[in-house]
Amino acid sequence: MITKFYKIEWREFDARCRRLARKILRDDTIKDIYGISRGGLPIAVRLSHLTRLPLTETPKSTTTVIVDDILDSGSTRESFKNFKHFEVLVNKKEEDIKEWVIFPWEKK
């Protein structure tokens, strides 16, 4: 049972979204944003506001950036392996985060 938590506050959420937005804007092939339900939806909305790119309900493999809250086991990423652009707010392996991640909109 996981008893340790890594809590992301709103300020950190916004800073992470701003970093992702800058990365997205550097790629002129990205035309819209698709948020994976449920965790990716708040991120997709924030990124849409920051980049002024529209949200989409029907992602396209080469022009849509797929966004999710966290990359842990990689199973969700595998589901979107045919998509060129895939971004997450938290990559547990790259960041060496072992705790359970709690986002600002979640209860502990």
Where are these regions (language model features)?
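PRPP-associated nucleotide enzymes
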Residues: 1-108
